[in-house]
Amino acid sequence: MKQAFKTVRRNRGAAGVDKISIDIFEANLQENLDALMRDLKTGRFRPKPLRRVHIPKGPRSKKTRPLGIPVVRDRVAQEILRRLLNPIFEPLFHDASKGFRPGRNCHQALEMAIEIHRLGYRYVLDADIMGFFDHLPHSVIMKAVARHVADGKVLDLIQRFLTAGVMEDGVFKPTTGGTPQGGVASPLLANIVLNHLDWQLDGAGYRFVRYADDFVVLCRTHQEAQEAHEFVQRVLEEDLELQLSPEKTHITTYGKGYEFLGFKLSSRSCRMRAKSEQKFKDKIRSLTVRKHNLDAKAVEKLNQVIRGTANYFATSFATVRWRFQKLDSWIRMRLRCMKRKRKNYNDNRKLRARYFRVKLGVLTLEEFCVGTGTHGNAHRVIPRNGATLTGVAR
């Protein structure tokens, strides 16, 4: 139970409806954990409603994504549940499922897609499940779990989490379907449900890669891709009571390229997609407002964004150096204007790149690229303390 709390603490997160933060919960940790354990053992545990918040899908987007924030106590209980279920289901998952699993990540999903393309699979069914986390029926979740879990207390606990409801603007709303984005156990439950689709695709002979509810089916011909579309639609509708989004699901080719996990993949390159680059720029803009001071705290926040972006996109299979150079130049322009407190200052070019890197300690995206390969750049990871750790992200 203490290990479960450590995981919750490491992931941080805001307080739930009870307004008890992680720090407040930790102040009486043993007492809180003992009470939670008693309630779980006796069956008296009742999850509190989630605090519903809506976050923008992007800085320039008017659309929002609903998140459900559990109270800290419930997060610990969900983490215990996740640790209990994971050893049962992990051996059952398909190898092409790369999301939210031990030892699996986005880069492995992208590498698998690239390797399949190299085998001659040039057509892509780029699939999107309509409102997956919001519309996933509770009955489908419970049926998928119950196939391998017979303990009534565990099943009852899952059911209680699913039906805990949400508080939005002070009003309670029951939850009759879906699993909340933001819930600790939600990614595992998603994998448990979609594992059925994985093995159905495998049994039909299709090659695919899935990361949570984001997946692509890779085919040799356009006709095969059309058949895959019909097959996926049928499995989702008949077995899982879900649907593909007609607007977001389409067939394309590796030559034309497609977007997957923040990248634009094509036969020519693997690079940041335009939306990912725009999100990065929007974050930098918010940190380089001219009226703000370019002090050590500002540099630290800036470096966090640069480091996170570089560590994700500067991989051994991605072509990013040329784009990173342009983005670094754009960042320096923002910093010069910030330093001079005005836009297009005539002599702000006098503040050279070396000034920002050496004197102020601002990282550059390009310095994470230390070598080039067939598809792009190996990279080094620069930890928060500034030490350099060399490695290849494979």
Where are these regions (language model features)?
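Right-hand nucleic-acid polymerase module
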Residues: 285-349
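Charged boundary/loop elements
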Residues: 1-22, 83-96
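Conserved polymerase palm-domain catalytic core
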Residues: 39-54, 92-257
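Extended C-terminal regions of large enzymes
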Residues: 330-331, 339-394
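Short acidic (Asp/Glu) and glycine-rich catalytic loops that position anionic groups and cofactors
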Residues: 11-18, 59-61, 89-93, 122-123, ...
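Hydrophobic alpha-helical hairpins/lids featuring a short glycine-rich hinge
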Residues: 67-84, 91
